[in-house]
């Protein structure tokens, strides 16, 4: 599958379910709050899974593709169990391997705003 369609399919799966099927075993995961690269599929499934569980909707605002790499600006509508909602823009940098598996993701977003949201502020 070409990389653009692959990324679009992944983001559709974030909305509808099944995103886990895209993730390779050998995976690198980076976040804006750390220089550390987390390694392994399970680490990503846990971290992204907690975030995606709050997501009511993901809208891809911009998508740039070069080879097997993708840069996306996405808007997530998040909701806490209390009903409180937040729209959060997230820059996501993805890399797919030749077998169409997601092998790397680095994300950037306003962590302060997200933490306040999680604290119910």
Predicted regions and their residues:
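Short, low-complexity N-terminal intrinsically disordered segments enriched in polar/charged residues
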Residues: 1-17, 21, 120-121
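A solvent-exposed, acidic/Ser-Thr-rich amphipathic alpha-helical stretch
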Residues: 5, 16-68
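Short, cysteine-centered beta-strand-loop-beta hairpins and adjacent loop/turn segments enriched
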Residues: 53, 78-87
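A short hydrophobic beta-strand element
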Residues: 67-76, 88
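Short beta-strand segments enriched in hydrophobic/aromatic residues
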Residues: 76-78, 109
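Short beta-strand edge/turn micro-motifs at domain boundaries
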Residues: 93-118
